[in-house]
Amino acid sequence: VHWTAEEKQLITCLWGKVDVATIGGESLAGMFVMYPWTQRLFSEFGNLSSPTAICGNPKVKAHGKKVLTAFGDAIRNLDNIKDTFAKLSELHCDKLHVDPENFKLLGKVLLIVLAGHYGKDFTPACHAAYQKLVNVVAHALARRYH
């Protein structure tokens, strides 16, 4: 994947403002609320019975932070995202059996959450760069499935 200097700057500039715990928790919770079938692999998280329960669930928040921390690894390694996510792709495919479509769904929710938190900074150009990034990350995570 080729990244322009502008894309790299837009991605890293916004990422410097991101509260990983908050954005990660809200993104994972949002995916569980908007796409409830994605909850099936998270029964150990306890109560996911309603949007209120999901959004207040400490395990959802903690895992969301973990997921977004890994997303930050992609940003630090924009020119080597496939290798950055090789082990995570293997884990999600071989051990966890996650539907690779879920990576795209989480990416969609992440974009919505970023737009909600960073409105004026989440310009159309920034949105386009982050859309490209979530697509590349989803593809890298799904790589083991192919």
Swiss-Prot record:
GO molecular function, one term: oxygen binding
Keyword Iron-sulfur recorded: no
Binding site for heme b: 63, 92
UniProt xrefs under InterPro entries: Globin (IPR000971), Globin-like_sf (IPR009050), Globin/Proto (IPR012292), Hemoglobin_b (IPR002337), Hemoglobin_oxygen_transport (IPR050056)
Disulfide bonds: none
Transmembrane portions of the chain: none
GO cellular component: blood microparticle; haptoglobin-hemoglobin complex; hemoglobin complex
UniProt keyword annotation of GTP-binding present: no
One GO process term, biological-process aspect: hydrogen peroxide catabolic process
Tissue expression from the record: Red blood cells.
Annotated signal sequence range: none
Domain Globin: start-end pairs: 2-146
UniProt keywords, alphabetically: Heme, Iron, Metal-binding, Oxygen transport, Transport
Function: Involved in oxygen transport from the lung to the various peripheral tissues.
Family the entry assigns: Belongs to the globin family.
Quaternary state and interactors: Heterotetramer of two alpha chains and two beta chains.
Protein name as annotated: Hemoglobin subunit beta-2
